[in-house]
Amino acid sequence: MATSVAKYFLLSRCSGIIRSVTLQGKLPPVCIRNSQCPSFSYGNRASDNPQDGHVNIPVDRLTVSYSRSSGPGGQHVNKVSTKAEVRFHVYTADWIPEDVRQKIILNNKNRINKAGELLVTSEQSRSQQRNMGDCIQKISDIIAKATEKPHEPSAEDIALRASRLEKRNKERLKQKKLHSAVKQTRRVCFD
């Protein structure tokens, strides 16, 4: 039942307004205008074309479960299952490119269980739908982080690093000679 609720209704809070979004198998791409509005698509941030590396997160491939949230709240927190737990099998997630999948596995070893499922939980809100949206946002952030390419240093950066290394080495040798000279002056000659 939790999966069907997640599949058809998602309440997301954008600029204080709660709206219902009907989902048809895949989550629609939503742009972030503020930090409260989740994005369900990801792409290569360095590219100019937003369709490059664009992958939607299919809701039907996610396993969603709800449980009791921890923390203060009295009777409400003890009665209502609002903590959302979203998981999916990383090794068979064909909607994620292979190199990104390997990077996710490498970077999130503590979130992957023995069955090979990436587990993401959220209990920030008192609403199941908001916690579900937060979990999907976390998955999107994990995938976006794994999608980012490492920064390639320019020739100027390499030259700057080499000059700093050379300067540091000269300073180290200078300090070494000073220390040696101080020790030389402390020696007593018994001749």
Curated annotation (Swiss-Prot):
Residues in a coiled coil are none
GO biological process terms held by the UniProt record: mitochondrial translational termination
Q: Where in the cell is it found?
A: Mitochondrion
Q: Which UniProt keywords apply?
A: Hydrolase, Mitochondrion, Protein biosynthesis, Ribonucleoprotein, Ribosomal protein, Transit peptide
Q: Which reaction does it catalyse?
A: an N-acyl-L-alpha-aminoacyl-tRNA + H2O = an N-acyl-L-amino acid + a tRNA + H(+)
Pfam families, alphabetically? RF-1
Alphabetical list of InterPro entries matching this protein = Mito_Release_Factor_mL62, Pep_chain_release_fac_I
The main place the protein resides is: mitochondrion
A molecular function GO annotation: translation release factor activity, codon nonspecific
Origin, by domain of life? Eukaryota
Provide the transit peptide span.
1-34
Its subunit composition reads:
Component of the mitochondrial 39S ribosomal subunit.
Kindly provide the name given to this protein in its UniProt entry.
Answer: Large ribosomal subunit protein mL62
Organism of origin: Salmo salar
- Report the gene name: mrpl58
